[in-house]
Amino acid sequence: MANVNIKPLEDKILVQINEAETTTASGLVIPDSAKEKPQEATVIAVGPGRFDDKGNRIPLDIKEDDVVIFSRYGGTEIKFGGVEYLLLSARDILAIVEK
């Protein structure tokens, strides 16, 4: 896991996108124009969660090092220390990939 000095707030999650495959199973190279936007990422940092109507904090089900599937067009792209990250809201996370 990368050591990043970015701490997400509330229900925000900092992820590093896992690069999509550049070749097919048969060895064909996939051109950039044909690649789909990746939707899988590794969680780098997790915010503490949002507050409910009564002021109780609702923790997130996601933790650092989880691999997640996220909404294709969700999040905000961030470049920090020469590395690209994506800052997502918890609602942008669709699933956790079990190892």
UniProtKB/Swiss-Prot annotation:
Together with the chaperonin GroEL, plays an essential role in assisting protein folding. The GroEL-GroES system forms a nano-cage that allows encapsulation of the non-native substrate proteins and provides a physical environment optimized to promote and accelerate protein folding. GroES binds to the apical surface of the GroEL ring, thereby capping the opening of the GroEL channel. The lineage of its organism: Bacteria, Bacillati, Actinomycetota, Actinomycetes, Mycobacteriales. GO terms for biological process: chaperone cofactor-dependent protein refolding. InterPro entries: Chaperonin_GroES, Chaperonin_GroES_sf, Chaprnonin_Cpn10_CS, GroES-like_sf. Keywords: Chaperone, Cytoplasm. One of its GO terms (cellular component) is cytoplasm. SUPFAM superfamilies: GroES-like (SSF50129). This is Co-chaperonin GroES. Gene3D superfamilies: GroES chaperonin. Heptamer of 7 subunits arranged in a ring. Interacts with the chaperonin GroEL. It is found in: Cytoplasm. Disulfide bonds: none annotated. Belongs to the GroES chaperonin family. PROSITE patterns: CHAPERONINS_CPN10. One of its GO terms (molecular function) is protein-folding chaperone binding. Pfam families: Cpn10 (PF00166).
